[in-house]
Amino acid sequence: MELEILSKQNPWWKDKAEIENDEDIRKWKDGKRKWVPSEINEISLKPFSLNFIFGPRQVGKTTLLKLLIKKLLEEGVEKERIFYFRCDKLTDFKELDEVLKTYFEFRKSKNISSSFIFLDEVTFPKEWFRTIKFYIDTGDFKNDVLVLTGSLSMYLKKEVELFPGRRGFGKDIIMMPLTFREFIKVFSPEIYEKIPKIERIEKEEIFKKAYEALPYFDRIQELFKKYLKIGGFPLAVKNEEITQDVKESYWAWIKSDLAKIDRSEEIFKRIAKAILEKMPSAISLNSIAKEFDISTHKTVFEYLDVMEKMFIVKILYHIELDKIIPNLKKNRKICFVDPFFFYLFSDICLTNLPDESVLVENVVASHLSRKFDSFYWKNQREIDVVIRSEEIIGFEVKWSEKADDFSKIKIGKMRNIFCLTKDLIDKEKNLIPISLFLTIL
């Protein structure tokens, strides 16, 4: 492969200031709203490291890589030590091999023994892992830091599991849409700086931090309503709206991913419609199959698994509170990982948006599931979300003007249940506003 092809993707080799003219960096700088993803600090930069970055489409993985490259250059890393290549035009592992051979020859000519190697969309070339494994085993990467991004095939085909004992100091990093707390940082950094974060899910800690944030409640509530409308995907945040172009672009990516794994677009849409129409109730795989004309419950299970691995949904299983284990046979709750998917699938599936209260409960469940093993519980009454932290804790979501006293309710090993409200706060009754809780989470 010609070195010139590599040079086009690494303009900083000529002049490190050229990183400022990179298309992704330029778009980032020109954005009305911009931020540096927190994941930039999670990537291991100690040789040898093989890092994998996962996440949904259009969540900003490429921008993250470019911002890290910019940071390394600003810190004085020799420009030729930084190698970036976008792999979506490569056919197979042999072409990836040619790319790496060309870079190895180049760095040898510069007497470089340690590099930062960024391979974006590395899962596009077929059997890409063969080349990476080969150069790890031959020792060519022994002094390098590798950062690889890819699609859901890394999960579905379990390709990451093909590197046992070959990761070094590397990490798996999941990059998700902005949480509500991160959303506040983008839109009101001056408030974000004053808002504390809870260290653990414990009553005294939660209410101490909640009361510290309470003076900013009006602005927090205003931003929460905005978050419900646009979610945390970068394009929606930058535009401050979910445009039709953004929805069409994301749906095109989903269809492309489905085609690669030989899954039906029509069945996918039926299940997405079922999720929207059944929320926030727990669903039966059998009933979804019958009601939405899908062959078997196994098909529904398989597509939900695909959706979860595409970082579109999170599945919450019923928890048995005596044994503290999930019951996989009972109905399961499905939540979208970001409000954006409500608007996308409502449009694509030609179905109405659910009530705002449903969207709010979904946001709570998705936020808690990012940090904790999350479930739900139902018997005579239902607890919307149950988390397994240092202890078993329940959360009931009430997007209304009234709320019950949850301080005295104990169910099995769940000794604490908090009621997340629209705007009520009462430590004695375990009541705390939803927006305030998500702000300090």
Which residues does each predicted region cover?
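N-terminal pre-Walker A segment at the start of P-loop NTPase domains
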Residues: 1-44
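Accessory nucleic acid-recognition modules appended to NTPase machines
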Residues: 2-3, 237-391
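Interdomain motor-coupling "hinge/lid" segment immediately C-terminal to the ATP-binding subdomain
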Residues: 2-6, 157-272, 276
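Hydrophobic anchor at the beta1->P-loop junction of P-loop NTPases
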Residues: 53
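Conserved lysine of the Walker
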Residues: 61-62
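Short glycine-rich substrate-engagement loop in P-loop NTPases that contacts/grips substrate
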Residues: 81-113
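Sensor-1/coupling segment of RecA-like P-loop NTPase cores
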Residues: 138-162, 307
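Catalytic cores of nucleic-acid endonucleases
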Residues: 399-441
